[in-house]
């Protein structure tokens, strides 16, 4: 569903309003005062979040974010505040960054927070967008789209609810019994709610959802408001780990370094184990890689997850850069050329159907594509203005530098064996010496996961990839990434990368002349006439072995403890190795998957709101493959 931005409008007295819904965004007596009286105080805050590890708020109707800014402001002012504040909010018609700035200027006391929000305001694409603010301690998860479709897909465990859509008379869908029933499913134990609405239908629907509601004095001349508390223990995600926040991460490539960084951001101590002498020396060691999504006409799972992964990855890269860490990357843009006229027509239809924001994706005809590439091209294609090239080794290193007091690296130590005990997991080296122990272990060791007996159920295959390097003259094109059944990237330190080959179950570590020729042929297909000027005597390159999955999606989650399961078995009922997780199967899209996969896994382990819709989380579950073979269940020996 395309996202149509809200249109900025005001009533005669200057109150922000929606012409589409015929209602105002806040009480005429003051939006900030209403947020503090109805929603913050109405949910017993700040007292209820004090002393907590994390606290989650779910809001229906983000509007222009005034409730969020007021809550963030109250959290900052509270010396007893929780360690991490999660604020999850759904909005069908979000404002543009420019209109947000116009609206937020009315409250100068919130200016620093509003500016930080504006700096990180996401591209207006459908689905979930996770933003880390206030040095990562305030996490805003925005759901852009229809709440009736999105809330049933959310996994949250909310401690408080802000019900702040337009009035039931103007926007009845947001107050329907079916939608309010989802709040009961999403409620954590002891969850509260507050809303300015005292509609009888709303209160009856909330009661049916498990909330005991009461009327209370209202705000701005409104006689009453509604407060409630959930009667039963909620079914949101619970912490999956032991009280000791300590994890082993096996592997220091994109998967492992990203996971270590996301756990450390939550205050976890992490031991990273890798046989190499430093981070990013295996499949994550290429000179440059590409960060961009893969749209589809039907917006399938791959399209949705690559969109979420690319946008979250960009957010993560910007935060590392803002922190002064030496990650090398450039959002120069990615040009994805059509393979042929049929594919070109399909690319046009994708853009016409989904109407994405122009700062995310647009179709460019041949002449504009040629201008962007700096080279005459035979076809047009997709242009991703925010697409980027990234140096994977620098990203791995930057991830591990974020929390030097919490991340300890054991380089040059190959894990030979992983053993479970009553206290968790211990990794041993080839001499039988313990490297480190922790209650939680994460397998992020690429194709090495195939040698771990506990992960025998995971169908990870090795895909050999060869990238070609050649000297690039200063100022030579292209200065953007160009893809067409291969890719060529801007030069880094005078060297340009082109590739890559993809050969499954091929263990040859040396460069092959035939693969160099294949990559030059791909380069010629991308930029006709370009390869002729490449000095073949100066060719170099690199070989890596990428962990691939059968369905081109990564594996993120707890490792199954059985080799097969009945197809009717729900994923949640498949036996797992307690405290053992995998981040695997990245294939050729490691940069797209890594940051989001790590955030998903860390959120699951910590019992926090998840950053992806439930069906997409299930699509990444390592146990999904067990439901595809023959019937029956066999436990590992």
Curated annotation (Swiss-Prot):
EC number: 2.1.1.61, 1.5.-.-
Cofactor: FAD
Region FAD-dependent cmnm(5)s(2)U34 oxidoreductase, residue ranges: 250-637
Key words, A-Z: Cytoplasm, FAD, Flavoprotein, Methyltransferase, Multifunctional enzyme, Oxidoreductase, S-adenosyl-L-methionine, Transferase, tRNA processing
Reaction(s) catalysed by this chain's protein: 5-aminomethyl-2-thiouridine(34) in tRNA + S-adenosyl-L-methionine = 5-methylaminomethyl-2-thiouridine(34) in tRNA + S-adenosyl-L-homocysteine + H(+)
GO cellular component terms listed in the entry, alphabetical order: cytoplasm
Highest rank taxon of the organism: Bacteria
GO biological process: methylation; tRNA wobble uridine modification
HAMAP family: MnmC
Name of this protein: tRNA 5-methylaminomethyl-2-thiouridine biosynthesis bifunctional protein MnmC
